[in-house]
């Protein structure tokens, strides 16, 4: 009984260490200097294809111009979503779609056909929190759709802030 308890404690410590390292890594997206979102998505997807047997379908449409800060956060969210799909979902396939929305907005979807996220684990990991914080920093919405044994889809939607142009100023007479 003591040996079993120790084995469980060691495995729990190992799992927590892996999660902590992954979370710290997620704070700094692994992108090359000056790399845009499309290039980063291609590079990270290619790297993941080389290191896993999970087929990944990547579709990138026309993308709007994004600022450097927005790009960094989007790349970080993508990295975390892809990592989660590979490491935790036990997915048989992953589909990634990135495109412009209403010409200036951006939409990213990372969907897998894995085991989904159990209700009691939703929003409890460092990775999910990190993605949500990144989305909030750029004013984006992050939606996670999941159900046990039905996979998970992470959807990021971003639109640039709207700027109102004031009407003509009339001088008082």
Describe each region flagged by the PLM.
Residues 1-173:
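Coiled-coil dimerization/phosphotransfer module
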């Amino acid at each position: 009984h003591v040996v079993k308890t120790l084995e469980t404690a060691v495995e729990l410590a190992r799992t927590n260490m892996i999660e902590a390292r992954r979370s710290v890594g997620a704070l700094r997206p692994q992108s090359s200097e000056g790399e845009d979102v499309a290039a980063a998505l291609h590079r990270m997807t290619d790297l993941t294809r080389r290191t896993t047997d999970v087929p990944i379908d990547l579709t990138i449409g026309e993308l709007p111009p994004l600022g450097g800060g927005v790009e960094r956060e989007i790349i970080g969210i993508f990295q975390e979503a892809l990592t989660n799909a590979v490491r935790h979902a036990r997915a048989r396939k992953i589909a990634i779609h990135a495109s412009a929305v209403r010409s200036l907005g951006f939409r990213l979807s990372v969907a897998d056909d894995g085991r989904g996220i159990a209700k009691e684990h939703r929003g409890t990991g460092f990775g999910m929190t990190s993605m949500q914080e990144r989305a909030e920093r750029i004013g984006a919405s992050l939606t996670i759709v999941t159900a046990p044994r039905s996979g998970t889809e992470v959807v990021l939607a971003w639109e640039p802030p709207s700027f109102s142009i004031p009407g003509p100023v009339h001088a008082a007479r």
